[in-house]
Swiss-Prot record:
Pfam families listed in its UniProt record: Mur_ligase_C, Mur_ligase_M
Cofactor(s) required for function per UniProt: Mg(2+)
Signal peptide: none
Lineage: Bacteria, Pseudomonadati, Campylobacterota, Epsilonproteobacteria, Campylobacterales
Presence of keyword Protein biosynthesis: no
Classification via NCBIfam families: murE, PRK00139.1-4
Record protein name field: UDP-N-acetylmuramoyl-L-alanyl-D-glutamate--2,6-diaminopimelate ligase
Binding site for meso-2,6-diaminopimelate: 340, 364-367, 415, 419
Motif stretch (Meso-diaminopimelate recognition motif): 364-367
Post-translational note: Carboxylation is probably crucial for Mg(2+) binding and, consequently, for the gamma-phosphate positioning of ATP.
Function: Catalyzes the addition of meso-diaminopimelic acid to the nucleotide precursor UDP-N-acetylmuramoyl-L-alanyl-D-glutamate (UMAG) in the biosynthesis of bacterial cell-wall peptidoglycan.
Key words, A-Z: ATP-binding, Cell cycle, Cell division, Cell shape, Cell wall biogenesis/degradation, Cytoplasm, Ligase, Magnesium, Nucleotide-binding, Peptidoglycan synthesis
Length: 447
């Protein structure tokens, strides 16, 4: 991308930065090439022309980011935790930007549509400049494992880093679980302020300036008691110094969110906001009632019978959703993304068979893969095939599930969340799980 930026480099004045060699070669007098891990193989094309090359590690020297950047990483919970913090800070009258899977937002305005969880380095710098121009105090961003490995966050000084959890995902990119864990944990090696899920056994971090939250272990922010029925209520206790039990803050919270895993997201978000603002816990706690969650994350699309859409596309993510409804009769409808980690497919089938009384296997985003082959991979993990229905057409699968759903049952439509497209080998179509459900019940009502 091309970023408007006036700077002098190697005694030459430039008006733009770009990580695209074609853009630079078209106008080398005005555009300075920025070399990153993603485009370094093209750098010789620039060098052959004797043009200047700015290494991505030097980029930060030409920007003055007077804004508190918060980076949130983890297998699950990034989007909800980031959105929760954004909501809390806005309610506290703090001018805040949010960047992540759902797009770029500033002060409740949708600035840019969704793209990568973490954009390219120049896009990120561009978004930061826009947030600063609009006088934001905080910049909340999701940080993917890809972005960490590809150094898409190079040069940023984080005011706070947050870890939600580490399970297994993106093994098509990282090759194995060890590399994936190492990528996540590498984000927390420095001595900066960090918030860590103390119950996460895979977490490795520098203990200097680490603050923790947990349900099961002793941590800086703990839950003394909680209820998940029908939504989250809890008594929280915060200790700034774990060695001094007399210095405590407590607060009662009530949240419209569902499920134990959302209680973890709440703990991460509340602790993050407390550390950033230094406000009392009892000032932050009441604001949780204003946050109703994120579209496509445990989203109730219809209440009776209960139909829920969720982004869960990993074994751990699916289990957390299932746990939220384990006392109900579950129909689970899902597929798996094509051209992605194949090893998780049978595991997804296995976890669904543990919780669901009926499983409907369908397409997700098959991309270049054959839909039937993806479904066969999922079936390998399901012992009882009698509870399985296969319908590769996702719309038909959802409609069939709705037609057979009883009032005391719950339909969990998993994998795509708030996505509004479906990607095939030769086409991309508009598709929304929510719209299919809403249209069905609207037509039913109209007769």
């Amino acid at each position: 991308m091309k970023l408007k930026k006036t700077l002098t480099y190697q005694h030459h004045a430039y008006s733009f930065l770009s990580d695209n060699t074609n853009e630079v070669l078209e106008n080398p007098k005005e555009i300075l090439f920025v070399k990153t891990p993603l485009n370094e193989k093209y750098a010789p094309l620039i060098a052959e022309k004797n043009l200047a090359i700015l290494d991505f590690n030097e980029l930060k020297n030409y920007f003055d980011f007077k804004i508190k950047i918060v980076g949130i990483t983890g297998t699950n919970g990034k989007t909800t935790t980031a959105s929760l913090m954004y909501s809390l800070l806005l309610d506290l009258n703090k001018k805040t930007a949010l960047l992540g899977t759902r797009g770029f937002f500033i002060d409740d305005k949708h600035i840019k549509e969704k793209g990568l969880t973490t954009p390219t380095l120049l896009e990120l710098y561009s978004d930061l400049e826009e947030a600063i121009r609009l006088k934001c105090e905080y910049f909340i961003m999701e940080v993917s494992s890809h972005a960490i490995v590809q150094k898409r966050i190079a040069g940023l000084d984080f005011a706070l880093k947050i870890l939600t959890n580490i399970t297994s995902d993106h093994l098509d990119f990282h090759q194995n679980i060890e590399n994936y864990r190492d990528a996540k944990n590498s984000f927390f090696k420095d001595e900066g302020l960090k918030v860590i899920n103390r119950d996460e056994t895979n977490a490795l971090f520098n203990p200097i300036n680490a603050r923790t939250y947990a349900l099961d272990k002793k941590a800086h922010l703990n839950v003394q008691a909680f209820s998940l029925n029908p939504s989250i209520s809890a008594s929280l206790c915060y200790q700034h110094d774990l060695r001094d039990p007399n210095l405590k803050e407590t607060a009662l919270i009530h949240s419209p969110l569902l499920g134990r895993y959302n209680l973890y997201n709440i703990l991460a978000g509340v602790l993050g906001v407390k550390l950033l603002t230094q406000l009392p816990l009892e000032t932050i706690a009441p604001l949780l009632e204003n946050f109703y969650g994120v579209k496509g994350r445990l989203e109730i699309v219809h209440s009776k019978p209960l139909v829920v859409v969720d982004f869960a596309h990993t074994t751990d993510g699916m289990q957390q959703v299932f746990e939220s409804f384990k006392n109900q009769k579950i129909t689970a409808l899902f597929g798996a993304g094509g051209d992605r980690d194949k090893t998780k497919r049978p595991k997804m089938g296995a976890i669904a068979s543990c919780y669901a009384h009926q499983i409907i296997l369908t397409s997700d985003n098959p991309r270049s893969e054959n839909e039937e082959d993806i479904i066969k991979d999922i079936l390998k993990g399901i012992n009882n095939s009698s509870k399985v229905i296969v319908e590769k057409d996702r719309k038909k699968a959802i409609l069939n599930a709705l037609e057979n759903l009883k009032d005391d049952e719950v339909l969990l439509i998993l994998g795509k969340g708030d996505e509004n497209i479906q990607i095939f080998k030769d086409k991309t179509i508009f598709f929304s799980d929510q719209e299919v459900v809403k249209d069905y019940y609207l037509n039913l009502k109209q007769g």
